[in-house]
From Swiss-Prot:
The lineage of its organism: Eukaryota, Fungi, Dikarya, Ascomycota, Pezizomycotina. It is a multi-pass membrane protein. InterPro entries: AOX, AOX_sf. This is Alternative oxidase, mitochondrial. It is an enzyme of class 1 (oxidoreductase). Catalyzes cyanide-resistant oxygen consumption. May increase respiration when the cytochrome respiratory pathway is restricted, or in response to low temperatures.
Amino acid sequence: MYLSRLPPRSIPCRSINQISRVVARSSKSRLEFVGSYQNSLTTNQTRCLRPFSSTSRSQLRDYFPEADHEHIKKTEAAWPHPNYPKEQMLTNISYAHRTPKDFSDRIALYLVRFLRFSTDLATGYKHDPVTITENGEKVLKKPYRMSERKWLIRMVFLESVAGVPGMVAGMLRHLHSLRRLKRDNGWIETLLEEAYNERMHLLTFLKMAKPGWFMKFMIIGAQGVFFNSMFLSYLISPRTCHRFVAYLEEEAVLTYSTAIQDIEAGLLPKWTSPEFRIPDLAVQYWKIPEGNRTMRDLLLYIRADEAKHREVNHTLGNLDQNEDPNPFVSEYRDKAAPHPSKGIEHIRPTGWERNEII
Protein backbone atom coordinates (compact mmCIF):
# COMPACT_ATOMS: atom_id res chain seq x y z
CA MET A 1 0.00 0.00 0.00
CA TYR A 2 1.43 3.36 -1.00
CA LEU A 3 1.34 6.16 1.55
CA SER A 4 2.09 9.71 0.52
CA ARG A 5 4.46 11.57 2.80
CA LEU A 6 3.33 14.94 4.09
CA PRO A 7 5.75 17.75 4.78
CA PRO A 8 6.61 18.27 8.46
CA ARG A 9 4.34 20.66 10.33
CA SER A 10 5.24 22.69 13.34
CA ILE A 11 2.98 22.47 16.43
CA PRO A 12 2.31 25.63 18.43
CA CYS A 13 3.43 25.73 22.05
CA ARG A 14 -0.17 26.28 23.24
CA SER A 15 -1.26 23.04 21.54
CA ILE A 16 1.63 21.18 23.14
CA ASN A 17 0.55 22.41 26.58
CA GLN A 18 -3.06 21.36 25.97
CA ILE A 19 -1.96 17.91 24.83
CA SER A 20 0.23 17.55 27.93
CA ARG A 21 -2.69 18.40 30.24
CA VAL A 22 -4.98 15.90 28.48
CA VAL A 23 -2.38 13.15 28.74
CA ALA A 24 -1.83 13.92 32.42
CA ARG A 25 -5.56 13.79 33.18
CA SER A 26 -6.01 10.53 31.26
CA SER A 27 -3.03 8.97 33.05
CA LYS A 28 -4.45 10.00 36.42
CA SER A 29 -7.91 8.64 35.62
CA ARG A 30 -6.36 5.44 34.35
CA LEU A 31 -4.44 4.98 37.58
CA GLU A 32 -7.63 5.65 39.56
CA PHE A 33 -9.52 3.12 37.41
CA VAL A 34 -6.85 0.47 37.90
CA GLY A 35 -6.86 1.08 41.63
CA SER A 36 -10.64 0.87 41.88
CA TYR A 37 -10.64 -2.20 39.64
CA GLN A 38 -8.12 -3.95 41.88
CA ASN A 39 -10.15 -2.99 44.94
CA SER A 40 -13.31 -4.37 43.33
CA LEU A 41 -11.51 -7.61 42.53
CA THR A 42 -10.34 -7.91 46.12
CA THR A 43 -13.83 -7.14 47.41
CA ASN A 44 -15.46 -9.62 45.09
CA GLN A 45 -12.98 -12.33 46.05
CA THR A 46 -13.82 -11.90 49.71
CA ARG A 47 -17.50 -11.01 49.55
CA CYS A 48 -18.91 -12.47 46.35
CA LEU A 49 -19.16 -16.23 46.82
CA ARG A 50 -20.88 -17.16 43.58
CA PRO A 51 -19.08 -20.26 42.31
CA PHE A 52 -20.57 -20.25 38.84
CA SER A 53 -20.95 -17.37 36.42
CA SER A 54 -20.65 -16.77 32.73
CA THR A 55 -19.18 -13.32 33.36
CA SER A 56 -15.80 -12.26 34.69
CA ARG A 57 -15.42 -11.84 38.44
CA SER A 58 -15.16 -8.06 38.19
CA GLN A 59 -18.58 -7.88 36.52
CA LEU A 60 -20.49 -9.95 39.07
CA ARG A 61 -23.41 -8.19 40.67
CA ASP A 62 -26.70 -8.99 42.34
CA TYR A 63 -28.75 -10.68 39.63
CA PHE A 64 -32.00 -9.07 40.75
CA PRO A 65 -31.19 -6.32 43.28
CA GLU A 66 -33.97 -5.30 45.63
CA ALA A 67 -35.49 -1.98 44.62
CA ASP A 68 -35.56 0.87 47.10
CA HIS A 69 -39.04 2.43 47.24
CA GLU A 70 -40.05 5.57 49.02
CA HIS A 71 -43.07 4.18 50.91
CA ILE A 72 -42.70 0.36 50.78
CA LYS A 73 -40.30 -1.14 53.29
CA LYS A 74 -40.64 -4.87 52.58
CA THR A 75 -42.80 -7.26 50.55
CA GLU A 76 -43.55 -10.58 52.22
CA ALA A 77 -44.01 -13.86 50.36
CA ALA A 78 -47.53 -14.49 49.10
CA TRP A 79 -47.40 -18.07 50.42
CA PRO A 80 -45.41 -18.27 53.68
CA HIS A 81 -43.34 -21.42 53.84
CA PRO A 82 -44.33 -24.00 56.50
CA ASN A 83 -41.85 -24.81 59.23
CA TYR A 84 -39.65 -27.84 58.55
CA PRO A 85 -37.85 -29.10 61.69
CA LYS A 86 -34.34 -30.28 60.88
CA GLU A 87 -34.90 -33.63 62.57
CA GLN A 88 -37.85 -34.36 60.27
CA MET A 89 -35.88 -33.32 57.18
CA LEU A 90 -33.16 -35.82 58.13
CA THR A 91 -35.40 -38.73 59.15
CA ASN A 92 -38.59 -38.37 57.08
CA ILE A 93 -37.11 -37.38 53.72
CA SER A 94 -35.43 -39.93 51.47
CA TYR A 95 -35.58 -41.26 47.95
CA ALA A 96 -38.60 -43.46 47.23
CA HIS A 97 -40.17 -44.81 44.07
CA ARG A 98 -43.79 -45.68 43.40
CA THR A 99 -44.21 -48.77 41.25
CA PRO A 100 -46.40 -48.11 38.17
CA LYS A 101 -49.78 -49.81 38.46
CA ASP A 102 -51.35 -49.22 35.05
CA PHE A 103 -50.64 -48.05 31.53
CA SER A 104 -51.01 -44.37 32.45
CA ASP A 105 -48.38 -44.70 35.19
CA ARG A 106 -45.96 -46.43 32.83
CA ILE A 107 -46.34 -43.70 30.21
CA ALA A 108 -45.57 -41.07 32.86
CA LEU A 109 -42.52 -42.99 34.10
CA TYR A 110 -41.07 -43.54 30.62
CA LEU A 111 -41.48 -39.85 29.80
CA VAL A 112 -39.65 -38.90 32.99
CA ARG A 113 -36.79 -41.27 32.18
CA PHE A 114 -36.48 -39.74 28.72
CA LEU A 115 -36.56 -36.24 30.21
CA ARG A 116 -33.93 -37.23 32.76
CA PHE A 117 -31.63 -38.48 30.01
CA SER A 118 -32.13 -35.27 28.00
CA THR A 119 -31.50 -33.06 31.03
CA ASP A 120 -28.35 -34.95 31.98
CA LEU A 121 -27.10 -34.48 28.45
CA ALA A 122 -27.97 -30.77 28.36
CA THR A 123 -26.42 -29.91 31.73
CA GLY A 124 -23.37 -32.16 31.43
CA TYR A 125 -24.34 -34.19 34.49
CA LYS A 126 -22.17 -37.22 35.11
CA HIS A 127 -21.79 -38.42 38.65
CA ASP A 128 -19.37 -41.11 39.74
CA PRO A 129 -20.67 -42.86 42.86
CA VAL A 130 -18.51 -43.28 45.93
CA THR A 131 -17.62 -46.87 46.88
CA ILE A 132 -16.84 -48.06 50.39
CA THR A 133 -13.77 -50.27 50.81
CA GLU A 134 -13.37 -53.03 53.39
CA ASN A 135 -11.55 -50.57 55.65
CA GLY A 136 -14.51 -48.18 55.53
CA GLU A 137 -12.73 -45.64 53.31
CA LYS A 138 -14.62 -43.74 50.61
CA VAL A 139 -13.01 -44.18 47.21
CA LEU A 140 -14.04 -42.92 43.77
CA LYS A 141 -13.97 -45.43 40.93
CA LYS A 142 -13.24 -42.67 38.41
CA PRO A 143 -12.05 -39.06 38.59
CA TYR A 144 -14.83 -36.97 40.10
CA ARG A 145 -16.72 -34.96 37.50
CA MET A 146 -19.28 -32.85 39.39
CA SER A 147 -18.20 -29.54 40.91
CA GLU A 148 -19.99 -26.61 42.55
CA ARG A 149 -20.26 -24.92 39.16
CA LYS A 150 -21.73 -27.98 37.46
CA TRP A 151 -24.17 -28.56 40.29
CA LEU A 152 -25.43 -24.98 40.01
CA ILE A 153 -25.79 -25.29 36.25
CA ARG A 154 -27.95 -28.36 36.74
CA MET A 155 -30.01 -26.86 39.56
CA VAL A 156 -30.69 -23.59 37.72
CA PHE A 157 -31.81 -25.44 34.61
CA LEU A 158 -34.01 -27.90 36.51
CA GLU A 159 -35.72 -25.25 38.64
CA SER A 160 -36.33 -23.01 35.62
CA VAL A 161 -38.73 -25.61 34.20
CA ALA A 162 -39.91 -27.17 37.48
CA GLY A 163 -42.28 -24.28 38.11
CA VAL A 164 -44.17 -24.88 34.86
CA PRO A 165 -46.43 -27.89 35.72
CA GLY A 166 -48.06 -26.33 38.78
CA MET A 167 -48.81 -23.10 36.94
CA VAL A 168 -50.24 -24.93 33.91
CA ALA A 169 -52.41 -27.21 36.05
CA GLY A 170 -53.63 -24.33 38.24
CA MET A 171 -54.46 -22.19 35.21
CA LEU A 172 -56.39 -24.96 33.45
CA ARG A 173 -58.30 -25.93 36.59
CA HIS A 174 -59.17 -22.26 37.12
CA LEU A 175 -60.59 -22.02 33.59
CA HIS A 176 -62.30 -25.39 34.06
CA SER A 177 -64.00 -24.10 37.20
CA LEU A 178 -65.22 -21.02 35.34
CA ARG A 179 -66.64 -23.09 32.49
CA ARG A 180 -68.40 -25.58 34.75
CA LEU A 181 -69.63 -22.85 37.11
CA LYS A 182 -68.46 -25.00 40.02
CA ARG A 183 -65.88 -24.88 42.79
CA ASP A 184 -62.48 -26.45 42.32
CA ASN A 185 -62.38 -27.84 45.88
CA GLY A 186 -59.03 -26.33 46.77
CA TRP A 187 -56.76 -27.78 44.06
CA ILE A 188 -55.85 -24.47 42.41
CA GLU A 189 -54.21 -22.92 45.48
CA THR A 190 -51.97 -25.93 46.13
CA LEU A 191 -50.87 -26.14 42.50
CA LEU A 192 -50.05 -22.43 42.31
CA GLU A 193 -48.21 -22.64 45.63
CA GLU A 194 -46.13 -25.48 44.21
CA ALA A 195 -45.18 -23.37 41.18
CA TYR A 196 -44.33 -20.45 43.48
CA ASN A 197 -42.13 -22.67 45.64
CA GLU A 198 -40.21 -23.97 42.63
CA ARG A 199 -39.63 -20.40 41.48
CA MET A 200 -38.21 -19.53 44.90
CA HIS A 201 -35.73 -22.38 44.45
CA LEU A 202 -34.64 -20.81 41.16
CA LEU A 203 -34.33 -17.31 42.62
CA THR A 204 -32.23 -18.69 45.46
CA PHE A 205 -29.77 -20.35 43.08
CA LEU A 206 -29.65 -17.21 40.93
CA LYS A 207 -28.27 -15.40 43.97
CA MET A 208 -25.27 -17.70 43.66
CA ALA A 209 -24.93 -18.01 39.89
CA LYS A 210 -25.63 -15.75 36.95
CA PRO A 211 -26.40 -17.79 33.80
CA GLY A 212 -24.82 -16.91 30.49
CA TRP A 213 -26.49 -16.46 27.14
CA PHE A 214 -26.30 -20.17 26.27
CA MET A 215 -28.09 -21.20 29.48
CA LYS A 216 -30.73 -18.52 28.90
CA PHE A 217 -31.25 -19.82 25.37
CA MET A 218 -31.65 -23.37 26.69
CA ILE A 219 -34.15 -22.21 29.31
CA ILE A 220 -36.27 -20.37 26.74
CA GLY A 221 -36.40 -23.41 24.47
CA ALA A 222 -37.09 -25.86 27.29
CA GLN A 223 -39.81 -23.68 28.79
CA GLY A 224 -41.55 -23.25 25.45
CA VAL A 225 -41.58 -26.97 24.71
CA PHE A 226 -42.43 -28.02 28.27
CA PHE A 227 -45.25 -25.50 28.77
CA ASN A 228 -47.06 -26.40 25.57
CA SER A 229 -46.56 -30.12 26.15
CA MET A 230 -47.98 -29.88 29.68
CA PHE A 231 -50.86 -27.72 28.46
CA LEU A 232 -52.00 -30.24 25.87
CA SER A 233 -51.31 -33.25 28.10
CA TYR A 234 -53.31 -31.85 31.02
CA LEU A 235 -56.28 -31.28 28.76
CA ILE A 236 -56.12 -34.94 27.72
CA SER A 237 -55.28 -36.68 31.02
CA PRO A 238 -54.76 -34.67 34.22
CA ARG A 239 -54.13 -37.84 36.21
CA THR A 240 -51.22 -38.86 33.97
CA CYS A 241 -49.74 -35.37 34.29
CA HIS A 242 -49.83 -35.49 38.09
CA ARG A 243 -48.16 -38.89 38.03
CA PHE A 244 -45.56 -37.53 35.62
CA VAL A 245 -44.77 -34.62 37.94
CA ALA A 246 -44.57 -36.99 40.91
CA TYR A 247 -42.04 -39.21 39.13
CA LEU A 248 -40.16 -36.06 38.14
CA GLU A 249 -40.02 -35.03 41.80
CA GLU A 250 -38.64 -38.46 42.66
CA GLU A 251 -35.69 -37.65 40.41
CA ALA A 252 -35.37 -34.22 42.03
CA VAL A 253 -35.16 -35.81 45.49
CA LEU A 254 -32.48 -38.15 44.17
CA THR A 255 -30.52 -35.26 42.64
CA TYR A 256 -30.49 -33.18 45.82
CA SER A 257 -29.73 -36.25 47.95
CA THR A 258 -26.67 -36.89 45.79
CA ALA A 259 -25.53 -33.27 46.13
CA ILE A 260 -25.93 -33.48 49.91
CA GLN A 261 -23.87 -36.67 49.97
CA ASP A 262 -21.15 -34.93 47.96
CA ILE A 263 -21.04 -32.10 50.49
CA GLU A 264 -20.85 -34.54 53.39
CA ALA A 265 -18.05 -36.46 51.61
CA GLY A 266 -16.00 -33.27 51.25
CA LEU A 267 -16.14 -33.29 47.45
CA LEU A 268 -17.46 -29.71 47.22
CA PRO A 269 -15.01 -27.62 49.27
CA LYS A 270 -16.37 -24.22 48.22
CA TRP A 271 -19.73 -25.05 49.78
CA THR A 272 -18.17 -26.24 53.02
CA SER A 273 -15.88 -23.25 53.42
CA PRO A 274 -16.51 -21.20 56.61
CA GLU A 275 -16.67 -18.08 54.42
CA PHE A 276 -19.60 -19.38 52.36
CA ARG A 277 -22.98 -17.79 53.14
CA ILE A 278 -26.33 -18.79 51.73
CA PRO A 279 -28.44 -15.94 50.27
CA ASP A 280 -30.55 -13.83 52.62
CA LEU A 281 -33.50 -14.60 50.35
CA ALA A 282 -33.30 -18.24 51.43
CA VAL A 283 -32.95 -17.36 55.11
CA GLN A 284 -36.10 -15.22 55.00
CA TYR A 285 -38.21 -17.59 52.89
CA TRP A 286 -37.47 -20.83 54.77
CA LYS A 287 -36.96 -19.04 58.12
CA ILE A 288 -33.64 -20.83 58.55
CA PRO A 289 -32.38 -20.45 62.14
CA GLU A 290 -28.94 -19.15 63.02
CA GLY A 291 -26.33 -21.89 63.05
CA ASN A 292 -28.07 -23.90 60.32
CA ARG A 293 -27.27 -21.67 57.35
CA THR A 294 -24.83 -23.82 55.41
CA MET A 295 -25.26 -25.02 51.84
CA ARG A 296 -26.06 -28.48 53.16
CA ASP A 297 -28.88 -27.06 55.29
CA LEU A 298 -30.24 -25.13 52.32
CA LEU A 299 -30.30 -28.27 50.17
CA LEU A 300 -32.08 -30.13 52.98
CA TYR A 301 -34.90 -27.57 52.82
CA ILE A 302 -35.09 -27.71 49.03
CA ARG A 303 -35.04 -31.51 49.03
CA ALA A 304 -37.88 -31.52 51.57
CA ASP A 305 -39.89 -29.25 49.25
CA GLU A 306 -39.33 -31.63 46.33
CA ALA A 307 -40.36 -34.58 48.50
CA LYS A 308 -43.53 -32.71 49.43
CA HIS A 309 -44.32 -32.07 45.77
CA ARG A 310 -43.74 -35.78 45.13
CA GLU A 311 -46.29 -36.68 47.80
CA VAL A 312 -48.82 -34.09 46.61
CA ASN A 313 -48.78 -35.13 42.97
CA HIS A 314 -48.81 -38.88 43.68
CA THR A 315 -51.84 -38.25 45.90
CA LEU A 316 -53.64 -36.03 43.39
CA GLY A 317 -52.99 -38.69 40.75
CA ASN A 318 -54.93 -41.18 42.89
CA LEU A 319 -58.06 -39.01 43.19
CA ASP A 320 -61.10 -38.24 41.08
CA GLN A 321 -59.92 -35.23 39.09
CA ASN A 322 -63.34 -33.56 38.94
CA GLU A 323 -65.09 -34.29 42.23
CA ASP A 324 -62.63 -35.04 45.06
CA PRO A 325 -61.46 -32.20 47.33
CA ASN A 326 -57.82 -31.35 47.87
CA PRO A 327 -56.78 -33.43 50.92
CA PHE A 328 -53.84 -31.17 51.74
CA VAL A 329 -56.04 -28.21 52.70
CA SER A 330 -59.01 -30.16 54.08
CA GLU A 331 -60.05 -30.46 57.73
CA TYR A 332 -60.39 -34.04 58.97
CA ARG A 333 -62.85 -35.46 61.46
CA ASP A 334 -60.20 -37.45 63.32
CA LYS A 335 -57.46 -34.89 63.86
CA ALA A 336 -55.27 -37.32 65.79
CA ALA A 337 -54.94 -39.77 62.90
CA PRO A 338 -52.16 -39.18 60.33
CA HIS A 339 -53.46 -37.35 57.29
CA PRO A 340 -52.14 -35.14 54.46
CA SER A 341 -51.00 -31.65 55.45
CA LYS A 342 -48.61 -28.91 54.38
CA GLY A 343 -45.92 -30.16 56.74
CA ILE A 344 -43.64 -33.19 56.54
CA GLU A 345 -44.47 -34.81 59.87
CA HIS A 346 -46.69 -37.45 58.20
CA ILE A 347 -45.25 -37.34 54.70
CA ARG A 348 -46.10 -40.30 52.47
CA PRO A 349 -43.39 -40.65 49.75
CA THR A 350 -45.55 -42.64 47.32
CA GLY A 351 -48.72 -40.66 47.98
CA TRP A 352 -51.94 -41.32 49.86
CA GLU A 353 -54.47 -43.72 48.40
CA ARG A 354 -57.99 -42.45 47.84
CA ASN A 355 -59.62 -44.85 50.31
CA GLU A 356 -57.32 -43.55 53.07
CA ILE A 357 -58.31 -39.90 52.90
CA ILE A 358 -61.60 -39.36 51.05
